[in-house]
Amino acid sequence: MSTHFKRILYGGDYNPNQWTKDIWQEDMRIFKDAHINTATINVFSWAKIQPSEHEYNFDELDEIVDMLSKENYDIVFATSTAALPGWMVRKYPEVMFTDYEGRQHKFGGRHNACPNSFVFKHYARELAYKLAERYADNPHVTCWHVSNEYGNECFCENCQKAFRVWLKDKYKTIDALNRAWNMEFWGHTVYDWDDVVPPNALSDGIGSEKTAFAGISIDYRRFYSDSQLACFKMERDAIRSVKPDAFVTTNLMGTFKGLDYFKWAKEMDVVSWDNYPSYDTPWSSIAMTHDLMRGLKDEPFMLMEQTPSQQNWQKYNSLKRPGQMRAQSYQTLAHGADTIQFFQLRRSVGGCEKFHGAVIAHAGSENTRVFREVAQLGAELESFGDRTLGSRNEAEVGLIFDWDNYWALEYTSGPSEDLKYVDQIHQYYQYFYKKNIGVDMIPVDADFSKYKIVVAPVLYMVKDGMKEALENFVKNGGILITTFMSGIVGQSDNVYLGGYPGPLREMAGVWVEEIDALAPEQKNKAKFADGSTAACGLLCDLMHLEGAKALASYEEDFYAGMPAASKNTYGKGTTYYIATQFEEEGLAKILDQAVQEVGVSSVIPEETGLEVVTRVSDITRFYFVMNFTDEEQILPESLTGKKDMISQKMTEHGMKLKKWDVLLLEEHL
């Protein structure tokens, strides 16, 4: 298995420019005790490197790079372009972004640039080039980190002009634009490209999450994602103009709504991301997001940031309990990471992140619980050498995640404000997670033939080519699982006429006549063929069978007796249509049928409360075994007699794992 790295990178964000040089040396001593081998530097240093328009000063950065190189660190080199220097804002105020309310921001904050500002792009490109020119040939520079956590939104004049250019390229004519956006509605016909304005609070926005014209707002999302991506590519290409084989990434943010990460991943050498769950985030949700980040390129990823213990920006910033950070890190490795990196290595003394966790706390020593846990994990990862690097996850289930659908579903007005895209995806992922069935998170244009089951929850927008791809998959023996609010609109958010689920109707063998929305306090029930019942709610499709077989039927309301779930034979395969949001037991009853029908297997034969994930190299299968429950769990019999790479001991019959306990077992192929 190929990988860019020679060892598991272990370290994180380091800002020695915030400290005196005597502390630098103390840091090197302490970091060595934690087995830290990498530092991400220069993330927010533009103001120091370029103190005025025509002046650069690399003296301090030279010292930092020399120090880390002498200590044999792998350097992740950031380009510093995520926060603008004051001189630029003072001289060129148009570089600052304009928010959804139409307010142009002043100097301050971060992620504060307009991506369509020619001034910003000129100086960002120049800075990336100069950094590469100076440091790219240093053998310790392992990876380039462009900007940081791309994520603002801008609605300024620069963006308005660029949006019009983007639209001209896409639609060619005003007539085509008017048809795509259905501009006869509310008399919104545009006569000239200059009539088009960004859909913010001053035009067709209805709050930041809703819109009068989803077609416009979805296109603006697409345009803005492309605009930010163009900035990333610009800096990447500036680096590669100096060093063509430079390894370049930027840190993504999981299920962040603003950017189409599948499109971004095609331009990145490796996906990296920042994992900051809250105290009550389900472990299945964390696992799903790791699998999504792995799925962006279908390759191992970098964990660019996590906190050693505490965050600072959530509502309740709980400490990670003893053993929790270690278990969380192994879960990250299990789902495809080749690096474990923290924000931050030394805790800041000021600013809004001064209470964000760090390897070195404000006490300034290694005599802390957090440091001891970091050091323990570092020693373990170091002992693995390169054995796990580049190993791959295997899956027979593909779960579709699509940013166009994310935007379209949540922009639409109705039928329920509680309908959230990521929640729906997670509901299905969680079933497979609890069964220890491997899942790939996949785009809509994936090769479906790799999977026995493809799950497409709330596939609201069926874009060109998707119908044919899904039909071919099912006809050739695959199982498709889809749900309510699927097959409703095309790629411009205009409804498919002829009845829901539109292009999926023949394959599903059902016609949805109406969609009922239930308030949180309202529930229905569905009855299965074996007489059991399950609660359901949120949305209830009123559907008619057109060749499909009912799996469950509603028990209550005027549509009692109508199907609540169905399956339809189509070619050699089957389409399952789930017409309502079942509670967990009911959903499991349906998905169990699909899994049994096609013979999808769990990682191990036993049912267990442990999370068990495998990665496979050319010569070894690695079993990551983790206990995230509150109870002791007995190790399944199929995992006994294997060597634990952490303890170097063989697993035994009846072995118990307490909460946060971890095993990494190896099986030679």
Cite the ranges covered by each PLM segment:
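Aromatic-lined substrate-binding rim segments of carbohydrate-active enzymes
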Residues: 26-32, 40-102, 235-242, 460
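N-terminal carbohydrate-binding accessory modules
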Residues: 1-40, 51, 66-67, 74, ...
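Polysaccharide-binding and catalytic clefts of secreted carbohydrate-active enzymes
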Residues: 102-270, 274-291
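The substrate-binding groove and active-site-proximal loops of carbohydrate-active enzymes
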Residues: 9-19, 44-59, 106-125, 147-154, ...
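Short, well-ordered coil/turn segments that N-cap beta-strands
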Residues: 6-8, 35-37, 69-75, 137-142, ...
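Short, acidic/polar
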Residues: 19-33, 124-130, 253-263, 321-329
